[in-house]
From Swiss-Prot:
The record marks 63 as: Important for phospho-donor activity. Keywords: Cytoplasm, Kinase, Metal-binding, Phosphoprotein, Phosphotransferase system, Sugar transport, Transferase, Transport, Zinc. Heterodimer with glycerol kinase (glpk). Binds 1 zinc ion per glycerol kinase EIIA-Glc dimer. The zinc ion is important for dimerization. SUPFAM superfamilies: Duplicated hybrid motif. Gene3D superfamilies: Glucose Permease (Domain IIA). This is PTS system glucose-specific EIIA component. Its cofactor is Zn(2+). The phosphoenolpyruvate-dependent sugar phosphotransferase system (sugar PTS), a major carbohydrate active transport system, catalyzes the phosphorylation of incoming sugar substrates concomitantly with their translocation across the cell membrane. The enzyme II complex composed of PtsG and Crr is involved in glucose transport. The lineage of its organism: Bacteria, Bacillati, Mycoplasmatota, Mollicutes, Mycoplasmataceae. Residues 26-130 form the PTS EIIA type-1 domain. InterPro entries: Dup_hybrid_motif, PTS_EIIA_1_perm, PTS_EIIA_component. It is found in: Cytoplasm.
Length: 154
């Protein structure tokens, strides 16, 4: 199929600062145990889908979302560190598991001020749990706006 050879553009899920996984204070992400990727230090409360695809994972705690693209690439957006312990408090989800989403669709609103007081960090990793054999290229570091192209999977 033609879409298997296309590059996948990955959008910033929110306003913030793009950082490397080396700057995330969690060994699972820093050591890339779940896959390669990058993180965003968020500055806006609304988080949007970084790619189009099927929402294969929507945690009931609303802190993490897994999206599978039509080409089979799987991306995990994990909002903050140890946020699973909040049991959804401070998170309002707008999507359900198995829903199709388009890049830029709003997934969740997070009360970042409240959440930041209760967890080690609000840095939010975007991980390629299945990169489909492609190579990740981060094309924009530092300050970004939601919807900016920040990475390309080639």
């Amino acid at each position: 199929m033609w879409f298997f050879n296309k590059n996948l553009k990955v959008l910033a899920p929110c306003d913030g600062t793009i950082i490397t996984l080396d700057e995330v204070e969690d060994e699972v992400f820093k050591e890339r145990m779940l896959g390669d990727g990058f993180a965003i230090n968020p500055k806006s409360n609304d988080f949007h889908a970084p790619v189009s695809g099927k929402l294969v994972t929507a945690f009931p705690t609303k802190h993490a979302f897994g999206i599978q693209t039509k080409s089979g690439v799987e991306i995990l957006l994990h909002i903050g560190l140890d946020t699973v312990s909040l049991d959804g408090n401070g998170f309002e989800s707008f999507v359900t598991q198995d829903q199709e989403v388009n890049a830029g669709d709003k997934l969740v609103t997070v009360d970042l001020k409240s959440v930041a007081k209760k967890v080690p960090s609000i840095k939010s990793p975007i991980i390629f749990t299945n990169n489909g054999g492609k190579t990740l290229e981060i094309v924009k570091m530092g300050e970004v706006k939601q919807g900016d192209v920040v990475a390309i999977l080639k």
